[in-house]
Regions:
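Beta-strand/loop-rich accessory regions of lumenal/periplasmic or secreted enzymes
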Residues: 1-189
């Protein structure tokens, strides 16, 4: 499909505005465009528990979660540090894996990590956020609301990428998906 992309760069700003258009010159009765998206690859340099994702919710709220939440039936501990889960949820760096003793490393080795996340605005009054551990497992619902502003972030404690989709909820059905969050290169589409 022929398409045009315009990118706007502003001095002193880290923001890039992208406007795209495509020309569909096919037979609408014979061909159908199933989806259209722009994919960004994001390097993930930190341990799974130091990686984070976030989506905007209704009324300016934000849903966020670490790729590997430090929560389970046992509490992860490290001498000289306070509550590690609280640090993690605040976006602070959790110490390197090697600093933990064997018992705590076992917890880190066995706690779930989430690979994919999806924000979907399926109608004017409902969005969902779902996640899964890998492509072979089903999506599970984590949060729902009315109208998302269409913002997403994926990255680690050293940085990442955020995108905003203008008029997201008004453009339903729309979705923003993060995949490969537990690999060296996450994708945001």
């Amino acid at each position: 499909l022929p398409f045009t992309i315009r990118a706007y760069f502003y001095g002193g700003s880290g923001e890039i505005k992208i406007v795209h258009s495509l020309v569909f010159d096919g037979d609408q009765n014979k061909y159908f465009i199933r989806s259209l998206g722009i994919r960004f690859d994001v390097p993930m340099r930190e341990a799974l528990y130091n990686r984070h994702v976030a989506f905007s919710c209704s009324d300016g709220g934000v849903w966020s979660e670490p790729v590997q939440p430090l929560i389970g039936r046992r509490i992860l501990t490290l001498d000289g540090y306070g509550p590690l889960q609280k640090m993690q949820m605040s976006g602070e760096r959790i110490p390197d894996y090697e600093k933990f003793d064997a018992k705590n490393r076992s917890l880190l080795d066995n706690w779930a990590s989430w690979d994919s996340y999806r924000l979907s605005q399926l109608n004017a009054d409902a969005f969902t956020i779902r996640k899964r551990t890998n492509g072979n497992n089903p999506w599970i619902g984590t949060f729902s609301g009315t109208r998302s502003n269409g913002y997403a972030f994926v990255g680690d404690v050293t940085g990442g990428l955020s995108v905003g989709y203008k008029d997201f909820w008004q453009s339903y059905p729309s979705s923003i998906e993060i995949t490969n969050a537990n690999s060296d290169k996450a994708s945001l589409t």
